[in-house]
Regions:
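Short, surface-exposed loop or secondary-structure junction motifs
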Residues: 1-130
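Structured C-terminal helix/loop/strand segments within mature extracytoplasmic catalytic/sensor domains
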Residues: 135-186
Length: 186
């Protein structure tokens, strides 16, 4: 076989000096990690482990879930994405990134390969450009990168604490993203 996704990501993260951004964080991170949900399936409060049940079944490592980080480390990743958009191959070759951010051909879909694209209903609000890409997490996280405006927004919350039955994030995300973009742009 090949290289596991967590090992491949750790190699990239080290090369880019992303710091605290990784799958399956060490137990030493738990005191500074926000808890998520009192999970009835696992019978305990989750903290420092993947929340997504499918991701947990896959050992805490999956392409759609399980990455832990700080605002600073996610911001460093966003900076690497912006540099790749500008032609400097930081996280991938620019042509590879272009493929990953290409909107799917499904009518009305905002999805790309691992990314969401801007729509009027997007979680990123209305201030980012049409070239913005983003990814949201069920637990209340999001990252939106706008190459046209050369900015990014990182939002890390624990909206599922103490339970997943909290939909306030759906209104909060667009508001926060819009407020940040308005504060950063002339």
């Amino acid at each position: 076989g090949g290289v596991r996704i967590d090992q491949q990501f750790a190699s990239i993260a080290d090369e880019l000096t992303l710091g605290d951004l990784r799958f399956r964080p060490p137990c030493a991170w738990r005191p500074r990690t926000a808890p998520t949900e009192v999970d009835p399936w696992r019978g305990r409060l989750l903290c420092g482990e993947v929340h997504d049940e499918n991701g947990w079944a896959l050992g805490g490592v999956a392409g759609h879930t399980g990455l832990f980080g700080t605002v600073k480390s996610v911001g460093r990743f966003a900076q690497a994405v912006l540099k790749t958009f500008s032609g400097e191959p930081k996280i991938a070759q620019p042509a590879t990134l272009a493929r990953f951010v290409e909107r799917s051909s499904v009518p009305g879909s905002s999805r790309a390969l691992g990314w969401d694209r801007m729509l009027v209903t997007s979680s990123c609000g209305h201030q980012l450009s049409g070239s913005a890409i983003g990814h949201t997490g069920f637990t209340g996280t999001s990252l939106w990168v706008d190459p046209q405006q050369n900015l990014y927004v990182v939002l890390l919350t624990n909206r599922v604490h103490p339970t997943r039955h909290n939909e306030a994030i759906l209104q909060l995300r667009p508001y926060v993203h819009d407020a940040i973009v308005q504060a950063l742009t002339p």
